[in-house]
């Protein structure tokens, strides 16, 4: 994957470059195609520590059919999907680079931004249809009290990658104290003028630090009594 052709440091860009996928992807779809270019279906689990604090998020990111097809190209035997072991180098490449982009996960409590540690429990799996899912646990740098509302969003600021929560069971709670609940605030639809901006030229001219993806990001809120 690549946010922009001029930004090869993106974690998914490295995967595409290593597997020579970018050329094939854009030859098939046309380089002028508007953002996004990659779609990810998200399921997240808010993980609580034994003391009742929120300790992290466990993500499952299911990639779209086109990315999955390129990711597993040349892997697997006898028509079977590749194993976790075969996909492990690809998982390692992706996750090692995610820190630079804050793991595409932005959490807050009381208006303060929360930081994460390096991901653990990393696996990459391909199902019987060769759809690829990246799973990992993202621990908070410091666990936080569940008695104050905790929120998070999963999105790509440059909107090269579209992250969308699954319709069914998008967010669950693990080991949560009694009475905890989870809700979601959906983003407002883009107005007509904003939709017209979604050209490749618009995104290539982004200034450093620009954040378009937040406009389309669902905010998940966890509240406990």
Segments from the language model and where they lie:
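Early extracytoplasmic/domain-onset interaction patches
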Residues: 37-69
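Sec-dependent N-terminal signal peptides
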Residues: 20-27
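A short catalytic or substrate-binding loop motif that flags glycine-/basic-rich loops and adjacent residues
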Residues: 36-38, 213-214
């Amino acid at each position: 994957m690549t946010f922009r052709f001029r930004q090869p440091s993106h974690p998914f860009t490295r995967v595409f470059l290593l597997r020579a996928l970018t050329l094939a992807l854009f030859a098939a779809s046309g380089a002028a195609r508007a953002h996004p270019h990659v779609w990810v279906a998200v399921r997240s689990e808010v993980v609580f520590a034994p003391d009742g604090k929120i300790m992290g998020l466990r993500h499952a990111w299911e990639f779209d059919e086109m990315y999955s097809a390129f990711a597993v190209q040349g892997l697997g035997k006898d028509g079977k999907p590749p194993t976790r072991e075969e996909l492990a180098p690809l998982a390692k490449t992706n996750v090692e680079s995610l820190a630079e982009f804050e793991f595409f996960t932005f959490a807050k409590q009381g208006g303060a931004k929360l930081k994460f540690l390096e991901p653990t429990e990393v696996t990459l799996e391909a199902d019987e249809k060769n759809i690829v899912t990246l799973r990992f646990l993202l621990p908070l740098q410091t666990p936080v009290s569940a008695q104050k509302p905790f929120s998070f969003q999963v999105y790509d600021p440059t909107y090269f990658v579209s992250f969308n929560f699954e319709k069914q069971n998008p967010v669950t709670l693990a080991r949560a104290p009694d009475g905890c609940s989870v809700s979601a605030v959906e983003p407002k639809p883009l107005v007509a003028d904003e939709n017209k901006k979604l050209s490749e030229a618009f995104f290539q001219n982004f200034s450093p630090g620009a954040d378009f993806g937040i406009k389309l990001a669902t905010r998940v809120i966890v509240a406990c009594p």
